From Swiss-Prot:
Database matches in Gene3D superfamilies: GHMP Kinase, N-terminal domain, K Homology domain, type 1, Nucleic acid-binding proteins
A Pfam family this chain is assigned to: S1
GO biological process, one term: mRNA catabolic process
Annotated compartments: Cytoplasm
Domain KH: 556-615
PANTHER family for this protein: POLYRIBONUCLEOTIDE NUCLEOTIDYLTRANSFERASE, POLYRIBONUCLEOTIDE NUCLEOTIDYLTRANSFERASE 1, MITOCHONDRIAL
S1 motif domain segment(s): 625-693
Keyword terms: Cytoplasm, Magnesium, Metal-binding, Nucleotidyltransferase, RNA-binding, Transferase
GO cellular component: cytosol
Residue ranges, compositional bias (Basic and acidic residues): 700-709
Protein name: Polyribonucleotide nucleotidyltransferase
Protein residues bound to Mg(2+): D489, D495
Source organism: Streptococcus gordonii (strain Challis / ATCC 35105 / BCRC 15272 / CH1 / DL1 / V288)
Main location (coarse class): cytoplasm
C-alpha cells in the first residue's frame, strides 16, 4: 500500500490523515494530524476467537513526553504506567467503539494510540478517537463504524467545537460527545450548573460536528478500506436453546422476579446450577462437551436477559417491584467516623458509599506532570470498589480503569461547587469507599461526598446529588428507568449518569450498548433525572442543611500573612534553613506562593501564632518616626549600634545620645543596655539612624549674656550638623 494523504478543515484547524506509510503490518493504521498534534493509531485482531464470555477489546492511549518536548522525570527517565489522564482518555475512546462490534464477536482486538506530537490547542484526544475509528474502519476487522467524537465548550452563550486551551479556561462546559452519523453513543461532561436545555443543545451541537468527521472518514474508507474478514461469531445451538427454554424458562422467570438482590441472585443461580448439572451429565462423554456447556451458559444468560427486558417493556414491572421512575429507599448520615475531618454515609437501596474528607496545606497538592505544563491539582476524589461490596472475592491492588473513571466522574461533579482558593486555601481530598453495590455506586459516592464536605465545614456553593438512568429499547418502543440497579445495568441498553445541584447539571456520563440514542430519549432521561436529583437533595438538606461554620477540631487551622516578594528569600533562608527551623520549632506547615502569601497550617492555634510572630519578625522593616525598645550591641567612637529587632540594627550617633554634649559614648550607654530609640532616617541602602535624645525632653535654652556670644562657645560647635551613619 502506498502513502495516501487526505485533508480537510475542521473547527478552524487543518485535519490531515495519512495512510499506507507507517505501521503497515497492523490490520489497520493511520496517522492523524490535527493542528500540530500528531497521533499514530494501529488496530490489530487475533486470528481466533477468545475463550472468555466477553469481547476482549483493549484500547490504549500512550502519551510520549517527547511529543511536548519534555524530558521524562523519575529515576528511570522513561515513560512508565499510563497517567490518570491517559487512562481516562483510553476509556473515552473504548466506550463509543465497543458497541460497534457484532453480538457474539469474541476475537481479541487491540487499538493502540500513540501521541507523537502535542499541540495544547488541538486536542490529541479527539484525534486519537478519530484515528481509532478510522484504523478499524479501513482494516479488515469487522467493525460496524465509523464513529467520531468532539469536545464542546460554552463561552459567552456560544457553543465552541474543540475549544482552545484559552477557551477551555473560561468555558462553563467541558463536554465530550461521540456517536455514529445517526445517533449519540457516548457522553462525558463536567459543567458549571448548566440547565438541562443547555446541556441537550450542547449534545446536539456536538453530534452535528460528529457527522462532519464521519463523512470525512467515509471518504477515506471508500478510497483505502480493506474488505472485512470473515470471523466466527459466538452462536448457540438452536435446538439446544429451544430445549432449555421449553424446560426451564418458567423457573427462571420466577427467579428473576424475586425482589431482594441476594435472594434473587441465589434463586437464578439455583436454576442455572440445575440446568448445568443436567447437561453435564447428559453430555459427559461427548467430544464437544466444552462447546455444549459454553452454549448452555450462554443460553441461560440470554434467557435471563430476555426476561428482565420483557418484564420492563411489557409488564412495566422492574425486578425489585419499583415503578420506572421510582428511586430506591434513601438514607443519609454525617459524622459516621470520629477523628477524620469530615465523613458522610449515603445509602440507596442496596448501594452504599462512605465518603471521607481530608484537608491539608496547599503544599500537599498533587503535582501533575504530563504533556501539559506542570500544574498543581488542589482537589482529588478517589473511588474504591472492594469485591466484598458485591459479596464476592477478587483481585486487590492498584485501582483499575473503572475505579479511576468513577473517581474522575465524582471529581467533576463536585469540583464545580468548591470554594475558591482565596475563600478556602486548603488542598481537599475525598475518598469514596463503596461498602455495598447494586448499581449506581459512582452516584452514591457523589452524594456521600457532598455530605462529607458539608460535615467537614467546606463552604461549598450548593449540595450535589447524582442519579443513574437506564434504558430498555426493542427498536420501536423504549422505557427510561430511574435509579437503575445492577441487573438493569447489566441487561439494559444505557447507563446515563447525571449529577448536579438545584441550579443545574455539574456532570454527565453516558454509555450505551446499542448503536445510539435519539434526542427524544435524551430529553426524557434528563427530565426524569432532574426530578430524582431534587428528591435526593431534599434528603441531603434534611440531614445537614448547610456546610458547618467551623472545621473539625482535628482539621488543620490556617492563618495567612502577606510579605513583600523580595522578603521571601529571607523567610526561606539559604537552602531552606530558616523556614525549616521555624517548622521544627513550632510544628506547623508553611506554604509561600510567588506573590508573597504565607499560609501557616496547624491544628494548634498557639503554634500558628508563634510561627506568625517569627515570620513577622524576619520580614519586619524599621520605619521613620517609630519607637523601638532596643539593645546596645556595639560601641564606636562616633556612636552606639543598637538592635531594633531580629537582624535589624541602627546607629545612634554620639550627637543623638543626649541633648547635652557627649564626649564619650560610654558615658551614656554600655553594651547590653536596653534603651528606647526613635528611627530618624533610613538611607537608600536600608541603613538606619536612630535617636535617643528625640525621646527625651529638650532642656530650656540658657539665658543670654555677652559671654555667650563668644564664637568659640562649645554650644556653637555642638549645633553644627552631626555626622550620621551614612556620612561616617
Amino acid at each position: 500500500m502506498t502513502k495516501q494523504v487526505f485533508k480537510t478543515v475542521f473547527a478552524g484547524r487543518e485535519l490531515v490523515v495519512e495512510t499506507g506509510q507507517v505501521a503497515k503490518q497492523a490490520n489497520g493504521s493511520a496517522v492523524v494530524r490535527y493542528g500540530e498534534s500528531t497521533v499514530l493509531t494501529a488496530a490489530t485482531m487475533s486470528k481466533k476467537m477468545a475463550t472468555g464470555d466477553f469481547f476482549p477489546l483493549q484500547v490504549n492511549y500512550e502519551e510520549k513526553m517527547y511529543a511536548a518536548g519534555k524530558y521524562p522525570g523519575g529515576f528511570n527517565k522513561r515513560e512508565g504506567r499510563p497517567s490518570t489522564d491517559a487512562t481516562l482518555t483510553a476509556r473515552l475512546i473504548d466506550r463509543p467503539i465497543r458497541p460497534m462490534f457484532a453480538e457474539g464477536f469474541r476475537n481479541e482486538v487491540q487499538v493502540i494510540n500513540t501521541v507523537l506530537s502535542y499541540d495544547e490547542d488541538a486536542s490529541p484526544q479527539m484525534a486519537a478517537m478519530f484515528g481509532s475509528s478510522l484504523a478499524l474502519s479501513i482494516s479488515d476487522i469487522p467493525f460496524n463504524g465509523p464513529i467520531a467524537g468532539v469536545q464542546v465548550g460554552y463561552v459567552d452563550g456560544e457553543f465552541i467545537i474543540n475549544p482552545s486551551k484559552e477557551q477551555k479556561e473560561v468555558s462553563l462546559l467541558e463536554l465530550t460527545v461521540a456517536g455514529t452519523k445517526d445517533a449519540i453513543n457516548m457522553v462525558e461532561s463536567g459543567a458549571k450548573e448548566l440547565s438541562e436545555d443547555v446541556m441537550l443543545e450542547a449534545l446536539l451541537k456536538g453530534h452535528q460536528a460528529v457527522k462532519e468527521l464521519i463523512a470525512f472518514q467515509e471518504e477515506i474508507v471508500a478510497a483505502v478500506g480493506k474488505e472485512k474478514a470473515e470471523v466466527e461469531l459466538l452462536h448457540v445451538d438452536e435446538e439446544l436453546q429451544a430445549e432449555i427454554v421449553a424446560a426451564y424458562n418458567s423457573d427462571l422467570q420466577k427467579a428473576v422476579q424475586v425482589e431482594e438482590k441476594l435472594a434473587r441472585e441465589a434463586a437464578t443461580q439455583a436454576v442455572k446450577d440445575q440446568v448445568t448439572a443436567v447437561y453435564e451429565e447428559k453430555y459427559a462423554d461427548h467430544e464437544e462437551f466444552d462447546r455444549i456447556m459454553r452454549d448452555v451458559a450462554e443460553i441461560l444468560e440470554q434467557m435471563e436477559h430476555a426476561e428482565v427486558r420483557r418484564l420492563i417493556t411489557e409488564d412495566k414491572v422492574r425486578p425489585d417491584g419499583r415503578k420506572v421512575d421510582e428511586i430506591r429507599p434513601l438514607d443519609a448520615e454525617v459524622d459516621y467516623l470520629p477523628r477524620v475531618h469530615g465523613s458522610g454515609l449515603f445509602t440507596r437501596g442496596q448501594t452504599q458509599a462512605l465518603s471521607v474528607l481530608t484537608l491539608a496545606p496547599m503544599g500537599e497538592t498533587q503535582i501533575v506532570d504530563g504533556l501539559d505544563p506542570e500544574y498543581k491539582k488542589r482537589f482529588m476524589h478517589h473511588y474504591n470498589f472492594p469485591q466484598y461490596s458485591v459479596g464476592e472475592t477478587g483481585r486487590y491492588g492498584a485501582p483499575g480503569r473503572r475505579e479511576i473513571g468513577h473517581g474522575a466522574l465524582g471529581e467533576r461533579a463536585l469540583e464545580q461547587v468548591l470554594p475558591s482558593l482565596e475563600e478556602f486555601p486548603y488542598a481537599i481530598r475525598l475518598v469514596a469507599e463503596v461498602l455495598e453495590s447494586n448499581g449506581s455506586s459512582s452516584q452514591a459516592s457523589i452524594c456521600a461526598g457532598t455530605l462529607a464536605l458539608m460535615a467537614g465545614g467546606v463552604p461549598i456553593k450548593a449540595p450535589v446529588a447524582g442519579i443513574a438512568m437506564g434504558l430498555i429499547s426493542d427498536g420501536n418502543n423504549y422505557t427510561v428507568l430511574t435509579d437503575i440497579q445492577g441487573l438493569e445495568d447489566h441487561f439494559g441498553d444505557m447507563d446515563f449518569k447525571v449529577a448536579g445541584t438545584r441550579e443545574g447539571i455539574t456532570a454527565l456520563q453516558m454509555d450505551i450498548k446499542i448503536e445510539g440514542i435519539t434526542a427524544e430519549i435524551l430529553t426524557e432521561a434528563l427530565d426524569q433525572a432532574k426530578k430524582a436529583r431534587f428528591e435526593i437533595l431534599d434528603l441531603i438538606e434534611a440531614t445537614i442543611p448547610a456546610p458547618r461554620p467551623e472545621l473539625a477540631p482535628t482539621a488543620p487551622k490556617i492563618d495567612t500573612i502577606k510579605i513583600d516578594v523580595d522578603k521571601i528569600k529571607i523567610v526561606i533562608g539559604k537552602g531552606g534553613e530558616t523556614i525549616d527551623k521555624i517548622i521544627a520549632e513550632t510544628g506547623v506547615k508553611i506554604d509561600i506562593d510567588e506573590e508573597g502569601n504565607v499560609s501557616i497550617y496547624s491544628s494548634d492555634q498557639d503554634a500558628i501564632n508563634r510561627a506568625k510572630e517569627i515570620i513577622a519578625g524576619l520580614v519586619r522593616e524599621a520605619k521613620v518616626d517609630e519607637v523601638y525598645h532596643a539593645k546596645v550591641v556595639r560601641i564606636e567612637k562616633f556612636g552606639a549600634f543598637v538592635n531594633l529587632f531580629d537582624k535589624t540594627d541602627a546607629l545612634v550617633h554620639i550627637s543623638e545620645l543626649a541633648w547635652t554634649r557627649t564626649n564619650n559614648v560610654e558615658d551614656v550607654v554600655q553594651i547590653g543596655d536596653e534603651v528606647d530609640v526613635m528611627v530618624i532616617k533610613i538611607d537608600a541602602k536600608g541603613r538606619v539612624d536612630a535617636s535617643m535624645k528625640a525621646l527625651l525632653p529638650r532642656p530650656p535654652k540658657p539665658e543670654k549674656s555677652d559671654k555667650h556670644h563668644d564664637k568659640g562657645h562649645p554650644h556653637k560647635k555642638h549645633e553644627e550638623a552631626p555626622l550620621t551613619q551614612t556620612e561616617e
